[in-house]
Amino acid sequence: MDNNFIFGIIAFTALVLVLAVIILFAKSKLVDSGDITISINDDPEKGITLPAGGKLLGALASKGIFVSSACGGGGSCGQCKVQVNSGGGEILPTELSHISKKEAKEGWRLACQVNVKSSMDVELPEEIFGVKKWECTVISNDNKATFIKELKLQIPEGEEVPFRAGGYIQIEAEPHTVNYKDFDIPKEYHEDWDKFNLWRYVSKVDEHIIRAYSMASYPEEKGIIMLNVRIATPPPRQPDAPPGQMSSYIWSLKAGDKVTISGPFGEFFAKETDNEMVFIGGGAGMAPMRSHIFDQLKRLKSKRKMSFWYGARSKREMFYVEDFDQLQAENDNFKWHVALSDPLPEDNWDGYTGFIHNVLYENYLKNHEAPEDCEYYMCGPPVMNAAVIGMLKSLGVEDENILLDDFGG
């Protein structure tokens, strides 16, 4: 046999072996393998052991530790902040829009962005260990306005979600396809759906998703969770954009369907003071407003002065009217007001008109003796929130008295 041929075979074999060694070495460094340990809060009883791989958010969830993530782990909401003292690697560019330089130095990271490659040491808020997961049953899912449904869920018998007014839960959904033409919507709300042909949309989701929703129910409403969910249709200027994944899924739910939720989460809680409370809401931002106001007046029997200012387009978009009318009749310390931005002729509306921040200012705060001493609780569309905050700042209201829930709008 030709010596050159034999030499060639030997050289080729040697090259393959060298490459194999390099690949195995690289794999040992770059590919997650084996079990790792995550030490939590320096408490041996809280530590977990699991295979390396995936993200910290998912690793914790696999062991029943649920960190809040309104965007479902996409890195866009910034809620899943945890302190990683060691083992988390370098902070990623995707995290820097939510984590300041000071926080980064202190070890703060987004759990949804931290790769689980080696053992690590993390710190989690103690309240996270009270978060649980439940499979609930849909009681009802009814339209309260043209683009808002009230989803009412039954908690499993013998269980309860120990939430505070202003809190929220997360809903999960498996891959699915939703056809808008199958939505059950009363005829009184068809006008806009027909006008913009919203029936044509289809939401196709190929992955497990999670989203957060503020609760409209309050703690005394035992055994149920109630949400106000606005359908996220594509904006008029982008009619071909995909509709909202989770809102489409929720709108497709019917009585008897099973839904997985986790919680409770939250920080949009009422301060324990005697200061006047001013609630400002719009759209699906009604949810935490209802929860707070019902809790203050029905459960706590609060005597604090409070008012609720709600903005809607037309009378058709108003809901829970009888509930708030009754609360107003039963409580001398509570008043509520609605402003319609675009009332219809058939509304025969003689109440406030215009945007809610202007109505609140012109009809109440402008002549208030000390608006800076009130506490302002708000939830609504981003444009409304920005307008209200700007107005309050012009009145000298400090940040500590402006409480905002970003979910409900």
Curated annotation (Swiss-Prot):
Domain FAD-binding FR-type: 131-271
Cofactor: binding details: Binds 1 [2Fe-2S] cluster.
Broad EC category: translocase
Residues annotated as transmembrane: 5-25
Domain of life according to the entry: Bacteria
InterPro entries for this protein: 2Fe-2S_ferredoxin-like_sf, 2Fe-2S_ferredoxin-type, Beta-grasp_dom_sf, Cbr1-like_FAD-bd_dom, FAD-bd_FR_type, Flavoprot_Pyr_Nucl_cyt_Rdtase, FNR_nucleotide-bd, NqrF
Keyword Metal-binding annotated: yes
Pfam families with a match to the protein in the record: FAD_binding_6, Fer2, NAD_binding_1
Domain 2Fe-2S ferredoxin-type: 34-128
Enzyme Commission no: 7.2.1.1
Residues binding [2Fe-2S] cluster: C71, C77, C80, C112
A GO BP entry: sodium ion transport
Location(s) in or outside the cell: Cell inner membrane
Cofactor dependence: [2Fe-2S] cluster; FAD
GO molecular function, one term: oxidoreductase activity, acting on NAD(P)H, quinone or similar compound as acceptor
Reactions listed under catalytic activity: a ubiquinone + n Na(+)(in) + NADH + H(+) = a ubiquinol + n Na(+)(out) + NAD(+)
Record key words, sorted: 2Fe-2S, Cell inner membrane, Cell membrane, FAD, Flavoprotein, Ion transport, Iron, Iron-sulfur, Membrane, Metal-binding, NAD, Sodium, Sodium transport, Translocase, Transmembrane, Transmembrane helix, Transport, Ubiquinone
Topology term for the membrane: Single-pass membrane protein
Chief localisation class: membrane
Subunit structure of this chain's protein: Composed of six subunits; NqrA, NqrB, NqrC, NqrD, NqrE and NqrF.
HAMAP family found in the cross-reference section: NqrF
Annotated family: Belongs to the NqrF family.
Function recorded in the entry: NQR complex catalyzes the reduction of ubiquinone-1 to ubiquinol by two successive reactions, coupled with the transport of Na(+) ions from the cytoplasm to the periplasm. The first step is catalyzed by NqrF, which accepts electrons from NADH and reduces ubiquinone-1 to ubisemiquinone by a one-electron transfer pathway.
This protein's name: Na(+)-translocating NADH-quinone reductase subunit F
Originating organism: Haemophilus ducreyi (strain 35000HP / ATCC 700724)
